[in-house]
């Protein structure tokens, strides 16, 4: 699973305007539950545990959502969890509704979150290997891929870093993972 980061002060690429696009932190638990196909109880639990839900709109239609974790993050498929240090945010559980894909909503939602979460200096995000749409949207939003989770025999073994930058090392520290290889 490739991991990317964006740090406050990094440039954000200019994205062409998308008419009527808006995105904001949401308190509408019913709408979030409907979009994410989760119970309102699950949405409330996420919010109470330090997760911020964002919804993107075109006109008044909700078209995408995503979450920012500020206390604890995790990758449920790997049974992996981690504590998030202050001034860091982990971006997770994003979805653009199928009928709205291919319009550049995802990178705009990521940038909107960066603009609105002013208390976060370092944003972290991962995506499934082979998910080229996510990889493209994350890159287009201005994130840099710095490492890849190393999984063998169904277990998370550590992190392979892409290069020797301070950000690559910071990713190992953020996720509390050993460095098992460099690429």
Residue positions per predicted region:
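Intrinsically disordered, low-complexity, positively biased terminal segments
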Residues: 1-16, 115, 121, 169-183
């Amino acid at each position: 699973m490739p991991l990317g980061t964006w740090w406050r002060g990094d440039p954000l690429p200019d994205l062409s305007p998308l008419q009527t696009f808006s995105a904001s932190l949401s308190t509408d638990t019913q709408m979030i539950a409907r979009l994410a196909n989760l119970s309102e109880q699950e949405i409330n639990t996420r919010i109470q545990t330090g997760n911020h839900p964002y919804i993107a709109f075109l006109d008044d239609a909700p078209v995408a959502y995503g979450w920012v974790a500020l206390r604890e993050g995790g990758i449920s498929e790997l049974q992996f969890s981690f504590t998030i240090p202050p001034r860091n945010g982990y971006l997770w559980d994003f979805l653009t509704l199928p009928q709205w894909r291919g319009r550049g909503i995802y990178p705009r939602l990521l940038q909107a979150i960066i603009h609105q979460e002013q208390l976060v200096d370092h944003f972290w995000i991962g995506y499934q290997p082979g998910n080229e749409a996510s990889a493209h949207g994350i890159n287009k939003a201005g994130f840099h891929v710095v490492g890849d989770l190393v999984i063998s025999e169904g277990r998370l073994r550590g992190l392979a870093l892409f290069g020797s930058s301070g950000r690559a090392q910071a990713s190992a520290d953020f996720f509390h993972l050993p460095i098992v290889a460099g690429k």
